Curated annotation (Swiss-Prot):
Encoding gene, per UniProt annotation: hemE
Protein name as it appears in the record: Uroporphyrinogen decarboxylase
Any Pfam family the entry gives: URO-D
EC number: 4.1.1.37
GO CC, any one term: cytosol
Lineage start: Bacteria, Pseudomonadati, Pseudomonadota, Gammaproteobacteria, Enterobacterales
Keywords in alphabetical order: Cytoplasm, Decarboxylase, Lyase, Porphyrin biosynthesis
Role according to the record: Catalyzes the decarboxylation of four acetate groups of uroporphyrinogen-III to yield coproporphyrinogen-III.
Native source organism of the sequence: Salmonella arizonae (strain ATCC BAA-731 / CDC346-86 / RSK2980)
Amino acid sequence: MTELKNDRYLRALLRQPVDVTPVWMMRQAGRYLPEYKATRAQAGDFMSLCKNAELACEVTLQPLRRYPLDAAILFSDILTVPDAMELGLYFEAGEGPRFTAPVTCKADVDKLPIPDPEDELGYVMNAVRTIRRELKGEVPLIGFSGSPWTLATYMVEGGSSKAFTVIKKMMYADPQALHLLLDKLAKSVTLYLNAQIKAGAQSVMIFDTWGGVLTGRDYQHFSLYYMHKIVDGLLRENDGRRVPVTLFTKGGGQWLEAMAETGCDALGLDWTTDIADARRRVGHKVALQGNMDPSMLYAPPARIEDEVATILSGFGQGEGHVFNLGHGIHQDVPPEHAGVFVEAVHRLSAQYHN
């Protein structure tokens, strides 16, 4: 593979020295960019965009042409794995993702296949290989998956949810069925991420978007336990380099110590966690990624720069920080405000790296 020209992001995840704090944005390839909207229109619909390696590569690279980002992230969706489990994924206008055949009981779980990542999910691996080729070693490529718990919420609820009553009913009334589902998902995600790594992903991230809706005890048993299983099963070296793993639980700031015990390299923080406090608690063990409120990008440029300065100061001197938003960038953010954010991180962070 091509020599990596900018490895700041990988070095920061491994708590190694860097010249400036690396930065990327969750959902950096997305609807806030007019060029993304044009490519999506060309594809026809969202999943067609995900399943076309050339177009998925194009939208992955679009933000890198605008901004000096330190990493690219595979353009895909967390629901590719449930989709490959034959649940009939479709997207309802204004409703988000839906499944025609949600999981309702143990018998449904027993019928679910574990997808072959180079077969049913081969389009994702083709996208990874295409993106790696087109990146030409400029920056590393991040692969990702949803966490078992987060994927299960969509599969059991039949789509997006606000109250999560259907999956919580299963969790409390039929925990055995839910554990079987989560175990099958953990195996599927491990295979899926390892295939992404073999195809060229240089770091991987597990998005536990809905872990924060659980009690502390349920989080341990139904979310973190299965992410730990995945981390244990991942390839941690490929192409002569360590492959760092980041865990991100939205709303999980109270569980950082337990998350840091999984063997991951870094933890993603949402904007509700104080980064100085997080570093005091787990900075000796893991790197931290985050954590500006994505809505801050609506503010005037000077206010965005102030917030970047505050977060950099909160983390303080030394290595182990990847700057990011605390969740995905909003679709109506002015693209030039994202540019202000990225430039400010690089310019203002040099003083923290000697």
